[in-house]
Amino acid sequence: MTSRPLAISAGDPAGVGAEIIAKAWRALRQDGPTFVVIGDAQLLASAGGGVKVRAVTRPQEAAQVFPDALPVLDIPVLSPVVYGRPSPSHAPQIIRWIETGVGLALSGAVSGLVTAPIAKAPLYEAGFQFPGHTEFLAELTAAASMVGARGPVMMLAAGDLRATLVTIHTALAKAPSALTTEAIINSGLVTAQALRKDFGIAEPRLAVAALNPHAGEGGALGREEIDIIAPAVEALRALGVQASGPAPADTLFHPEARARYDGVLCMYHDQALIPVKMLDFWGGVNITLGLPIVRTSPDHGTGFDIAGRGIARPDSLIAAIQLAAKIAARRGV
């Protein structure tokens, strides 16, 4: 396992981020992985139910601090925080926490970045221009050199299911027109590359989901399978990827089907998210593939409805931390 800590950006201060980070530290403080939080130290202490917090100035200090206190690179929120009430006034700090984490990961000071949940609406009100975390991280890392196909490609992992998305934060009504053969090929290449490099699968098998019911019924229910998806599958095969499909999505996620592939390429957001959350609602992990840094996050949102009540579960964040550490170790960072 890498000796460098992970970084965790604290997410929206009005949500459950600080609470689940404190709970994750309690669960991992003795056996790791070690991490340093980028956020508001005072908020983390209060949200964590009295958890001991220690401000650090460098990530390298985290290893010594971690068994006894939660190490924090303290960047305070500059406006009042009310749990459950997100505010555009928090946007500068939220963005700075993410930017700081990316900078530390790119410099090698940390082994990877785990991001606590953010809410898009208050960020948009403050002028944020990206559909979500994934696209913002791609922009922040765009100048970094990287070998092979690059992302961002969103993967959701739960148990033995690893599902990647061709269209990410796209309205369902717009997803069909957003599909292109080139996008499917790139997502497939990035996924196959990640399965080899990050998950240790020497010869990954990739299933490709159809868009339409019954894979389009030979064009009767839509031509996307014929005109867009099938050509992408053929191109992936020609490029050396063990790809199969397009297959009807309702046949791809039962246990026997999952045994026949190592990753599944989904055409739109909920085609991947629904089976992942059905399989493991509490423990799913979001991984951004195709970046020059390791990035994971919990597979849930900000939890404004339960923020400040002390009942948020840290399972998904813990899984995200553990998976980020495993990927970093495989990459040797």
Curated annotation (Swiss-Prot):
Belongs to the PdxA family. Catalyzes the NAD(P)-dependent oxidation of 4-(phosphooxy)-L-threonine (HTP) into 2-amino-3-oxo-4-(phosphooxy)butyric acid which spontaneously decarboxylates to form 3-amino-2-oxopropyl phosphate (AHAP). The active site is located at the dimer interface. GO terms for molecular function: 4-hydroxythreonine-4-phosphate dehydrogenase activity; cobalt ion binding; magnesium ion binding; NAD binding; zinc ion binding. Pathway: Cofactor biosynthesis; pyridoxine 5'-phosphate biosynthesis; pyridoxine 5'-phosphate from D-erythrose 4-phosphate: step 4/5. Its EC number is 1.1.1.262. This is 4-hydroxythreonine-4-phosphate dehydrogenase. A divalent metal cation binds at residues 169, 214, 269. It catalyses: 4-(phosphooxy)-L-threonine + NAD(+) = 3-amino-2-oxopropyl phosphate + CO2 + NADH. One of its GO terms (cellular component) is cytoplasm. Homodimer. It is found in: Cytoplasm. InterPro entries: PdxA, PdxA_fam. SUPFAM superfamilies: Isocitrate/Isopropylmalate dehydrogenase-like. Keywords: Cobalt, Cytoplasm, Magnesium, Metal-binding, NAD, NADP, Oxidoreductase, Pyridoxine biosynthesis, Zinc. It comes from the Bacteria. The gene is pdxA. Gene3D superfamilies: Isopropylmalate Dehydrogenase (3.40.718.10). Its cofactor is Zn(2+); Mg(2+); Co(2+). Substrate binds at residues 133-134, 277, 286, 295. GO terms for biological process: pyridoxal phosphate biosynthetic process; pyridoxine biosynthetic process. Binds 1 divalent metal cation per subunit. Can use ions such as Zn(2+), Mg(2+) or Co(2+).
